[in-house]
């Protein structure tokens, strides 16, 4: 029997804030923040190379009952399906959107798997920069 990868939870505010500085992967159901841990951080937290995940559901999404339901759906999707795709020594924070409540469970797991496996997808061109005119005479002077 194949052993399941143990997925640990982020619990402290400092851990969430550290992941916030990492890569952001946007989707229609949630925003995923991803950050690879250094070996020293893993040793300090005594987590080894297990992935860690944290969930954020803001009050904007509804009352406590609705927020907890969204959180439970995301946890189950990670536990059953998407957790196997998680990279070792990586922290994930999932910031849920209201659409995660009513989305079909299959769509939720597909979206999680897609965002977990997406490695640094960036739009072409990076930041936009406007062209500055060459310095020269003002008003023809």
UniProtKB/Swiss-Prot annotation:
Residue ranges that the Swiss-Prot or TrEMBL entry lists as coiled coil: none
Region (Disordered): 37-56, 114-141
One protein family per Pfam: Ribonuclease_P
GO biological process assignments: tRNA 5'-leader removal
Ranges of biased composition (kind: Basic and acidic residues): 114-124
PROSITE patterns: RIBONUCLEASE_P
GO molecular function: 3'-tRNA processing endoribonuclease activity; ribonuclease P activity; tRNA binding
Family label: Belongs to the RnpA family.
UniProt gene name: rnpA
Transmembrane spans: none
Protein's UniProt name: Ribonuclease P protein component
């Amino acid at each position: 029997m194949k052993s399941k990868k143990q997925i640990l939870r982020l619990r402290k505010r400092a851990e969430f804030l550290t992941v916030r500085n990492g890569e952001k992967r946007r989707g229609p159901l949630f925003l995923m923040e991803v950050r690879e841990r250094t070996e020293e951080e893993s040793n300090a937290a005594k987590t080894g190379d297990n992935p860690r995940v944290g969930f954020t559901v803001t009050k904007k999404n509804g009352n406590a009952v609705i927020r907890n339901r969204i959180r439970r759906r995301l946890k189950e999707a990670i536990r059953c399906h998407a957790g196997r795709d998680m990279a070792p020594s990586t922290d994930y924070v999932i910031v849920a959107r209201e659409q995660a409540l009513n989305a079909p469970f299959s769509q939720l797991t597909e979206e999680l798997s897609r965002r977990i496996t997406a490695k640094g997808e960036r739009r072409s061109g990076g930041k936009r920069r406007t062209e500055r005119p060459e310095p020269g005479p003002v008003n023809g002077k």
